[in-house]
Amino acid sequence: MFNLVEKRRWFFIISAFLIIPGVVAMIYSTATTGAPFRLSIDFVGGSIYDLAFAQPGITEGDIRDAFAEYDDRSLTVQRLTLDDGSERWSVRGSFLEQEQRDAIFDNLNEISPLDRERTQVESVSETIGSEVARAAFFAVLAASFIVSFFIIIAFRTVPNALRYGMSAIAAMVHDVLVVMGLASIMGLFFGWEVDALFLTAVLTVLAYSVQDSIVLFDRIRENIPQYLGEPYETIVNRSIWETIHRSLATQLNAFFIMAAILLFGGETIKQFIAILFIGLVSGTYSSIFTAVPLLVAWEKGELPFMSRIGAMLPAPRPTEDNGI
């Protein structure tokens, strides 16, 4: 049986290579734009106008003139040519009241009649955007605490139960950094924006990652009394091989579905599916090759800093119950 846990330092190096480019991209993006990635109006507020005109020949200058009285400094104007050859304009600006938007539409109609059936407007106030961003932060934070508490309680009969919870959180942090780094890199090079769907993808990735970690930890817990006398590292390696087929089978089902959506789905959800796809790959990797090797390294005293933290915290009282 190949000893995966023995190669844990290589797995940690691979994790570093996956995380560091994204962290660098987030630092660069923060230094240049003030945010680690391009934020949609869901988080910063504003308005997006999808404009369609009945007649061609509209220029960017015409559109800027129509907005000049109400929203000129923050305006971003982009011309889009659809597959059928029709022309649309995507305009992004600050949040405006309905009366101001109506006045802008009047200005645009004077230049060229708007196709009202194909013209769309999406607006989010800055207050709502900041509330969504705050809620997103607390949602991820709450998920981390709840998962840690659950694992500590569920594995209370295992020595050093806190280490299981902390290792699962480390895998979650790994996956969040991979997904956030991907969003930052794609935002810098391809203009991807982080919206409310991104938060959905992150929470979904965390759920899959935690599920895999718990399955592995549960098998370790079952094998510890069954293989008394074996080194802890050997028991953990055996547990990985006994559960790896289940982890891969579960994730492959999701991968095939997402791959089909990426190939044949609509453009509006492809970014969400791509983030989810990469996140689930990272979640599968981190559960097997980050959380469990980290647990072994901690148990073997290879993480003195983490050992000192664990010694400062009270250990849960063991019980006779081995169930979750």
Residue spans for each PLM region:
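A structural signal for conserved, well-ordered secondary-structure elements
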Residues: 1-324
